[in-house]
């Protein structure tokens, strides 16, 4: 058959836009095309890089086809295109023209995202392929309405050279005659089909194709934009002459002088221009960092690995990248360490049989490219569950299984035999002696073990590793604040058991304090952990942040927590450039040794498939860097080799870090803690300002949550930061009861004491107060009814402000000493001179048991107390003035108990639980001092009674709030004294 038989000239006229797939016949080269080659059971040392190619010697349509090569079995080659809109439920047909150098089969595939943006289906069909051009197709029915689909083709264990052309997606069960997405298409690419470059002059290629029967004089209008820095510039219009059924590539010498992820978009006359994106980074200085002396940024797992199928690992060529190129990109983003999860079950799949893949190859390539490996040991040995792939592994089968873990996954704790554990440590440390110095002992053991259960494993690992390699560094504890993990409590208990004697460094995962806007700011949590180390004489141990996949502001996390859909985990994993940079700066300026926060999958930019909400490690398409990688590039450029002088807080509500060069000049990064609060900065002559990616900006401007870099001398003197407004209304809260009142929380943001007059519109009267610098005051205004929002007028006599804020809804209110009847019985809360007294009577039918770490899952009473309910009204999240108490009656496993949140001393509380059958009465008296109060005052509280039968909580009945009480203090009701 003639290789050109399916030319456009022989096809009927098409309806423009009928085929949603861009560059579907590859006349625009490799623009938009993504390929991945998985090399099964073949590691990085034996890497075979098979790249996608455009072949102009054979085509089914036009002049070009896509050529994929898979020369041997044991591999997989995947080809994918940008996502397309498929908004309707129903049938869709994917078709394409294919031929191969030998008969075989290929897998057509369509990834479809459902309407909720989370659920996705993978539909596939194997079809035969011959040595002649043949049109193949597959039809699938999608029941759920969804926004997008991604066409894929996979060569799976079928060695061949394959040519592809004329890809089309049709609605319905029939493949319509092939037609491109538009009569004219245009796109851009970089010479060499690169996805990222170092700043400077490069060849930008403009591709244009005319699929019509008419000659065209096209005008291509391009613009370059970068979202994080609001950068945009227009390129001069370009004229392109095209004959019928022809394509052309025009090279342009272009200066890429703006750091960031540059998006090229625009228009082409009579057609469609497909957007493209490229990462532009600065070439970093060749500064060699010493992990024993210098702060280093790292990440989790190699950037070219993905688990493939149940029993295999596979190294992947991402589009045109080799492993070295992938690591070059990570090094360009400032990464110098990799936390490598050495999976025991892969390392020793059978007793005494040590596998060399992928561990040997991965570690070898890291050392070759200048990445310090940090090997994490013990992941497979911590837990197991029925049906898990490690259930029949020899280590698990001869280990002792304990109670369930503290995760809601159905897993149980696994206690590996100590002899097996020591042998594994010896095997790994000995094998990589001279290559790997750093070893972390178990991932987040506080979710699986009690301190007394973990410390023996740590001790054994430390002693065994030191015997195998005295020069190795053992990183211990690795506690997490995620999944309600009691990070501080676990570290403290480990300290009591002498754990720090078996650590050369201590790691933690600060999920409970991701940034400085949290209720417990990130820097405060670091100091808390350091205080625990000092308590046990271990203050000289280096402290590492070895994982933090989720880095969000308080506002972002609040929004994410409100999302009940499965999309929540995807929102968690989407990390912005400013948040990653802020965490690096916080960690270094507050004395951490290293920070290895994100995972390799988070370094992908999903530009071509933004709505395909699947895990990043399953969504490699092109090697475009994520924006936070450009921010990491700037971080290294500004800080590597510099002396960190510590944190710098120019003004309340700001945060920063400051550094010193060897010549005495300084570098600083400063930002606003909350994204809704802005400041103004002004740098004196000689001080330069740079944006988050290191582009120079004006020396005067607005300071937001995106850090601004400053370079110059004596920055604390030559840089001014001021609030954009003197006062902030942090929030307005409605208070019910006999008298309805609104509380208005006003903050003086300036560095001077201010006299402020406050007047809410539509409310009688106005009030004044003197507010010290950077302090707040709460104004209480009686109202006849509550509005949804109020406009507040503020004045210091010189300047007037108008601020509109929504009202935090009213909750229940009760007077001190009044008895409240409830579905479970009754309660009374009384503000006594010596403290706050609770008396709760509960009717119960059956006593339920619970785990000691989760008292809320058993029969019992839960108290929520906010001793300052009308201040800090910008944050509903818990703060240091919110307390929790759990009172549980006796069960078959536990005596009657009382436990509290970490900020409340349980020993100061007088309490008693009286039982009568299954019914019980709990009485508690909490001293005012314990609640950080000097005397009785109005406060907020809630009471939830938990009902459990056997080992499962049946219900939880709150008085005022709901199931969000554990994280939202605005749910609590009010206790009034009058």
Q: Where in the sequence are the language-model features?
A:
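Intrinsically disordered, low-complexity Pro/Gly/Ser/Thr-rich segments with frequent PxxP/GP/PP motifs
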Residues: 230-258, 761-787
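Aromatic/acidic polysaccharide-binding cleft in carbohydrate-active enzymes
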Residues: 550-637, 649-654, 663
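C-terminal beta-strand-rich structural cap/linker in extracellular carbohydrate-active enzymes
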Residues: 698-729
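Carbohydrate-binding surface patches
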Residues: 203-210, 214-216, 648-685, 692, ...
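Structural preference for beta-rich elements and adjacent junctions enriched in aromatics
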Residues: 782-978
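Aromatic-lined substrate-binding rim segments of carbohydrate-active enzymes
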Residues: 327-332, 337-406, 420, 424-429, ...
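Extracellular and organelle-lumenal recognition/adhesion modules and their flexible linkers in secreted
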Residues: 13-251, 255, 267-270, 274-277, ...
């Amino acid at each position: 058959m003639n290789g050109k038989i399916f030319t456009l000239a022989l096809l009927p006229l098409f309806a423009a836009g009928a085929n949603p797939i861009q560059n579907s016949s590859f006349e625009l080269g490799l623009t938009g095309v993504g390929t991945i080659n998985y090399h099964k059971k073949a590691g990085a040392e034996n890497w075979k890089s098979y790249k996608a190619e455009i072949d102009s010697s054979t085509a089914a349509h036009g002049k070009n086809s896509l050529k994929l090569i898979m020369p041997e079995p044991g591999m997989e080659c995947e080809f994918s295109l940008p996502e397309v809109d498929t908004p309707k439920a129903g049938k869709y047909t994917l078709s394409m023209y294919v031929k191969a150098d030998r008969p075989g089969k290929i897998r057509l595939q369509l990834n479809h995202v459902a309407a909720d943006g989370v659920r996705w289906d993978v539909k596939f069909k194997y079809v035969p392929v011959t040595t002649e051009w043949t049109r193949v197709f597959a039809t699938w029915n999608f029941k759920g309405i969804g926004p997008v689909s991604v066409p894929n083709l996979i060569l799976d264990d079928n060695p061949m050279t394959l040519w592809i052309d004329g890809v089309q997606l049709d609605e319905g069960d029939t493949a319509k005659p092939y037609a491109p997405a538009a009569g004219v298409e245009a796109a851009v690419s970089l010479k060499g089909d690169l996805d990222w470059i170092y700043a400077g002059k490069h060849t930008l290629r403009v591709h244009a194709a005319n699929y019509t029967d008419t000659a065209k004089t096209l005008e291509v209008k391009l613009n370059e934009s970068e979202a994080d820095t609001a950068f945009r510039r227009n390129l001069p219009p370009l004229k392109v002459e095209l004959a019928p059924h022809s394509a052309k590539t025009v090279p342009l010498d272009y200066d890429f002088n703006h750091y960031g992820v540059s998006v090229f978009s625009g228009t082409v006359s009579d057609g469609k221009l497909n957007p493209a994106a490229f990462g532009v980074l600065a070439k970093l200085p060749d500064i060699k960092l010493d992990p024993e002396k210098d702060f280093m940024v790292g990440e989790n797992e190699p950037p070219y690995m993905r688990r493939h199928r149940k029993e295999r690992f596979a190294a992947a060529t991402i589009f045109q990248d080799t492993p070295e190129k992938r690591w070059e990109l990570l090094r360009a983003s400032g990464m110098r360490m990799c936390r490598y999860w050495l999976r025991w079950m892969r390392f020793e799949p059978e007793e005494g049989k040590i596998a060399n893949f992928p561990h040997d190859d991965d570690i070898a390539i890291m050392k070759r490219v200048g990445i310090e490996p940090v090997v994490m040991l013990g992941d497979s040995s911590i837990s197991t569950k029925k049906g898990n792939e490690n259930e029949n592994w020899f280590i698990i089968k001869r280990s002792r299984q304990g109670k369930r873990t503290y995760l809601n996954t159905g897993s149980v704790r696994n206690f590996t035999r100590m002899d097996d554990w020591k042998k594994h440590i010896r095997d790994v440390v000995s094998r990589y002696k001279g290559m790997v110095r750093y070893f972390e002992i178990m991932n987040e053991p506080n979710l699986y073990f009690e301190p007394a259960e973990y410390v023996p494993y740590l001790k054994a690992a430390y002693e065994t590793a030191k015997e195998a390699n005295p020069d190795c560094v053992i990183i211990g504890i690795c506690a997490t604040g995620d999944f309600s993990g009691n990070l501080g409590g676990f570290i403290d208990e480990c300290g009591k058991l002498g754990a720090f004697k078996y650590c050369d460094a201590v790691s933690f995962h600060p999920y409970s304090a991701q940034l400085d806007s949290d209720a417990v700011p990130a820097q405060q949590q670091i100091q808390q952990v350091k205080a625990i180390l000092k308590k046990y004489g271990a203050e000289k141990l280096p402290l590492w942040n070895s994982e933090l996949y989720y880095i969000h502001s308080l506002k972002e996390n609040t929004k994410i927590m409100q999302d009940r859909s499965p999309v929540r985990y995807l929102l968690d994993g989407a990390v912005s450039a400013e948040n990653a940079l802020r965490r690096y700066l916080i960690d270094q300026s507050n004395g951490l040794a290293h920070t290895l926060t994100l995972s390799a999958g988070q370094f992908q930019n999903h530009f071509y498939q933004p709505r395909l909400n699947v895990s990043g490690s399953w969504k490699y398409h092109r090697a475009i860097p994520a924006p936070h990688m450009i921010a990491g590039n700037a971080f290294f450029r500004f800080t590597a080799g510099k002396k960190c002088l510590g944190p710098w807080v120019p003004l309340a509500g700001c945060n920063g870090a400051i550094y010193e060069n060897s010549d005495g000049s300084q570098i600083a990064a400063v930002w606003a803690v909350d994204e809704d609060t802005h400041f103004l900065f002004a740098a004196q002559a000689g001080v330069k300002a740079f944006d988050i990616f290191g582009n120079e900006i004006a020396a005067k401007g607005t300071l937001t949550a995106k850090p601004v870099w400053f370079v110059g001398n004596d920055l604390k003197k030559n840089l001014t930061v001021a609030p954009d407004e003197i006062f902030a209304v942090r929030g307005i809260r409605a208070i019910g009861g006999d008298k309805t009142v609104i509380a208005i929380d006003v903050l003086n943001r300036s560095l001077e004491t201010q006299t402020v007059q406050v007047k809410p519109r539509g409310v009688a009267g106005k009030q004044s107060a003197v507010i010290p610098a950077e302090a707040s005051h709460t104004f209480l205004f009686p109202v006849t009814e509550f509005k949804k929002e109020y406009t507040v007028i503020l004045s210091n006599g010189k300047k007037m402000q108008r601020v509109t804020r929504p009202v935090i809804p009213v909750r229940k209110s009760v007077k001190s000493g009044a008895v409240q009847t409830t579905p479970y019985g009754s309660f009374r809360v009384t503000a006594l001179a010596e403290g706050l007294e609770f008396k709760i009577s509960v009717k119960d039918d059956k006593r339920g048991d619970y785990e000691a770490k989760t008292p809320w899952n058993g029969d019992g009473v839960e108290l929520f107390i906010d001793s300052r309910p009308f201040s800090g009204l910008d944050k509903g999240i818990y703060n240091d003035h919110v307390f929790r108490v759990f009172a549980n009656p006796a069960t078959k496993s536990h005596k009657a108990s009382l436990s509290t949140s970490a900020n409340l001393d349980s020993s100061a509380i007088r309490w008693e639980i009286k039982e009568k059958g299954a019914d019980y009465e709990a009485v508690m008296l909490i001293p005012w001092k314990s609640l950080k109060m000097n005397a009785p005052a109005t406060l907020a509280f809630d009471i939830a009674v938990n009902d459990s039968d056997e080992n499962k909580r049946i219900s939880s009945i709150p008085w005022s709030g709901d199931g969000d009480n554990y994280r939202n203090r605005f749910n609590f009701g009010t206790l009034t004294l009058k």
